[in-house]
């Protein structure tokens, strides 16, 4: 179970960072990155 939680959190952080890069390159303006 601990491995599942660790994998889920890792996937969440990875997808979140990818979203930050995509939103930053789109020049959305709502997020200042």
Curated annotation (Swiss-Prot):
One of its GO terms (biological process) is photosynthesis. One of its GO terms (molecular function) is electron transporter, transferring electrons within cytochrome b6/f complex of photosystem II activity. GO terms for cellular component: cytochrome b6f complex; plasma membrane-derived thylakoid membrane. Its main location: membrane. It comes from the Bacteria. It is a single-pass membrane protein. Keywords: Electron transport, Membrane, Photosynthesis, Thylakoid, Transmembrane, Transmembrane helix, Transport. InterPro entries: Cytochr_b6-f_cplx_su8_sf, Cytochrome_b6-f_cplx_su8. Pfam families: PetN. It is found in: Cellular thylakoid membrane. Belongs to the PetN family. Component of the cytochrome b6-f complex, which mediates electron transfer between photosystem II (PSII) and photosystem I (PSI), cyclic electron flow around PSI, and state transitions. This is Cytochrome b6-f complex subunit 8.
